[in-house]
Amino acid sequence: MPALPLDQLQITHKDPKTGQPKTSAALNPEQKADRYFVLYKPPPKDNIPALVEEYLERANFVANDLDWLLALPHDKFWCQVIFDETLQKCLDSYLHYVPRKFDEWVAPTPEVADMQNHLHRSVFLTFLRMSTHKESKDHFISPSAFGEILYNNFLFDIPKILDLCVLFGKGNSPLLQKMIGNIFTQQPSYYTDLDETIPTILQVFSNILQHCGLQGDGTSTTPQKLGERSPLTPSDMPLLELKDIVLYLCDTSTTLWAFLDIFPLACQTFQKHDFCYRLASFYEMAIPELESAIKKRRLEDSKLLGDMWQRLSHSKKKLMEVFHIILNQICLLPILESSCDNIQGFIEEFLQIFSSLLQEKRFLRDYDTFSPVAEDISLLQQASSALDETRTAYILQAVESAWEGVDRQKIKDIKDPPRAKGSNNEVTVTAEPVSEMPSQLENLEEDEECMGAAAALGPAVSGVELDSLISQVKDLLPDLGEGFILACLEHYSYDSEQVINNILEDRLAPELSQLDRGLERQVKPDPTPLLSSRHNIFQNDEFDVFSRDSVDLSRVHKGRRKEENVRSLVNDKQAVVAQWQRYQKYSVVVEEVPLQPGEYQADDYEDEYDDTYDGNQVGANDADSDDELISRRPFTIPQVLRTKMPGEVQEEEWDEEDEVEEEAPKPDHFIQDPAVLREKAEARRMAFLARKGYRPENSTAVTGGPRGHGQSRETTQERRKKEANKAARANHNRRTMADRKRSKGMIPS
């Protein structure tokens, strides 16, 4: 007889009241054991014995109850899970309060770390069994009833699934993928819940922007109250408030990435809400402001700011991965898996997503660094021959323009950490490293980002200050080497107190614990010593002892040479002989040129010929040929030296029509009457203007008659006209504008 599923199974048991056998459903509240599950509380941050003891006692109760629950048979387990509310509250409290791997928590004692790992494993196995509808061929639940049990009893919901992914995703990815996939497969209503949850996730981004003063309430039409303060920007808000925002962003981005990495089928639901564009817009507005705010506070608390910078870098990386997972799931993977006839829709979706992001310059740069856009477009070109080259070229050009003015340094992609492998019937659980130093964010951050954060927060300690820190540690722990102390100081941001405390409590980081404690300090050579970087006229010559090891000492002589005297030095013509070949090549020095009889050397200079006055046409000249006489310019007397001939006419400079003037009178060297000269000049000017057709205005009316005798009507009109038209005489229109102002009533009359 085949076994029945648990939801249809009937069991017979004795009625405690009547003692008679009674048949009831296997999933019955009466089958629930009377057991109270205590709530989980997070471990203490400080090593206070009372707090540690309280935590260990409570955690021990929770661990024992979960171990008892996991040991129950199939029907008893599901009765306890469905009908015991204290169990659900206990599991919810663990998901709510357990420290994440990016939280600021360090296990105060090894006992606390062991207990935390035990609880971590037990909670994961409990949820894993709750998500399995078939444990064996005899113990199973029908799929339809299983989905109803999960959904109607709130055993799983979207927030729980998100917490499960972020808490247990590392090292347990295959189990989580099977677990969450089974939940969504057996109960499709969870897709509807996820669709209703995504607006809340988008509201988280809006809340961060509003809290940073980067986005106002667009739905509000009422004006802001006078007494109401506008939100502070990240650069102005207190440091602890900025820290809370960074932690909130880190939690949100890590949770989203963990969920989509485990369950990528949810990407279609996310993209229904235009999630890619909303994510890129949030990234463009929030990330640069938060980075700038942290860099501006480099002098406040270097340790806290370094931790915040690492968390912000981690958030950036996870947001990039979220975008990449969605793009890869809804566009690229279907293109690779589909035939050529069905990929046009996916290609159009890819181009549409990037076309909406072209104005987000910072996001495009960071995503192009994380995953080059050109490679994705190259994949599209290989998959389809009908790809719109204009749109792809436009997208690539926009990505290149986003890099303008920025040093393009590619960062190596970080490989995913290895995941635990397990068979179908073998449960493999890797506990989270809750006891490790969270501020380092191990296995989360790339080395380049950490180094960039350290560089941005200020220069490293060096010189006398570094020697002082080393001596502080060495005075208390003299057996340690200076090299080991220096490595500890560099790891803990040059905090000598933290170094001493961690050494005494044996809580050093793993990379420091492996070092030799007697390691001596190594002197770092100067990268650019002066001797190797100098440059002068003796650089690399035969006597430069800094660039060569051996020098010919026979060429070096100190003092006066005794073998030679001044006469022998003067008679030494070796230098002249050495230059002879050079001058001979260029034919500069020629002593004698042999000539054959009858030859004439035209270049020779003849003393009998004197050409001193040839240029001035003075003296006896040789007879010239007819062609030379024709082509030569005739000699003329300069105009300044000429004497005016009686019949010659003179043209005035201002006569543009070349009209012939009357013959000028003979120059008179005596001084004439100035009044006569002025009259002649005025006559010449009037004659010139008359030829031009210029008619001067009659200004006699403006001049007027003598004072006290009155003015004529023409004089009064001309003066009024002159007063009104002063602007035409470069008076800048002051009178007209003054009248205009007065007519408008701006100036009292």
Swiss-Prot record:
The gene is Ascc2. Residues 663-675, 711-726 have a biased composition (Basic and acidic residues). GO terms for biological process: DNA repair; regulation of DNA-templated transcription; rescue of stalled ribosome; ribosome disassembly; ribosome-associated ubiquitin-dependent protein catabolic process. GO terms for cellular component: cytosolic ribosome; DNA repair complex; nuclear speck; nucleus; RQC-trigger complex. The keyword DNA repair applies. The modification Phosphoserine is found at residue 625. Belongs to the ASCC2 family. It comes from Mus musculus (Mouse). It comes from the Eukaryota. Identified in the ASCC complex that contains ASCC1, ASCC2 and ASCC3. Interacts directly with ASCC3. The ASCC complex interacts with ALKBH3. Interacts (via CUE domain) with 'Lys-63'-linked polyubiquitin chains, but not with 'Lys-48'-linked polyubiquitin chains. Part of the ASC-1 complex, that contains TRIP4, ASCC1, ASCC2 and ASCC3. Component of the RQT (ribosome quality control trigger) complex, that contains ASCC2, ASCC3 and TRIP4. Interacts with CSRP1. Interacts with PRPF8, a component of the spliceosome. Interacts with ZCCHC4. One of its GO terms (molecular function) is K63-linked polyubiquitin modification-dependent protein binding. The modification Phosphothreonine is found at residue 233. This is Activating signal cointegrator 1 complex subunit 2. The CUE domain specifically binds RPS20/uS10 ubiquitinated via 'Lys-63'-linked ubiquitin chains by ZNF598. The keyword Phosphoprotein applies. It is found in: Nucleus; Nucleus speckle. Ubiquitin-binding protein involved in DNA repair and rescue of stalled ribosomes. Plays a role in DNA damage repair as component of the ASCC complex. Recruits ASCC3 and ALKBH3 to sites of DNA damage by binding to polyubiquitinated proteins that have 'Lys-63'-linked polyubiquitin chains. Part of the ASC-1 complex that enhances NF-kappa-B, SRF and AP1 transactivation. Involved in activation of the ribosome quality control (RQC) pathway, a pathway that degrades nascent peptide chains during problematic translation. Residues 465-508 form the CUE domain. Residues 649-662 have a biased composition (Acidic residues). Residues 1-26, 606-675, 689-749 are annotated as: Disordered.
